[in-house]
Amino acid sequence: MRSGTLRDVSSPGAALASGVSAGFVSGVLIAGVGGRLAMLLLRVTSDPALRGFLTDDGFTIGRVSVETLFLLGVTAGLGMAGGIFYLVVRRWIPARWRIPLMTLFFALVGGAGVIRPSEVDFTLLAPLPLAVALFIAIPAAYGAMMTWMAERLLREDSILRRRSWAWIVGLAPLAFANIVGIAVLLVAFGVWALGRSAPGLVAAWRSQVATRFGRAALIVMAVTSGAGLVRDGLDILG
């Protein structure tokens, strides 16, 4: 890649690296480590006979094993996906509301995705209110931390912009995603190239109409997920 091209992609590359890095770190720490700590707490508060019991996700309650490392890999991948998603929707959200709204959004969407009345985590573990609260709090905390980190990494004086190559290091977590990470880079490069060749598309994407549609889509996702979360939560708590 020529130096001119490298300079051209450094700004969008740093933006992508911000979402990837923030999502990776938040996914591993909050969803991965935090999720295991939540399960440890629930093991302590639940029937001791559940130790060694397999959950619906294939993980062993109360035991650190190879499955735990796999879980960290999964949460890292999901975290990066969430960080990239945030980059897409970020401009639709007023700056001062980004952290609280993303915290709420991920609490609803993430909670609805995790909490299922038929799963072991929400039938055998006790107390059930604590289990429900923990698995809503974890995606909420992820949303808060990821957004906070991404906003700081997106600043002009962030560590990803202090050197011309720093953003490349910020994209390194994509290596954990193997072929998916390569696909993300190819799609991102394609979007960047399309934006350079068709500035009208960029203007349309940044228009008020697109912003309204984007906000409406986020609201629909949050409301739909929230309704499902309330329904499943009430079903679990009986």
Regions inferred by a protein language model and the residue ranges of each:
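Juxtamembrane/disordered regions of integral membrane proteins
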Residues: 2-238
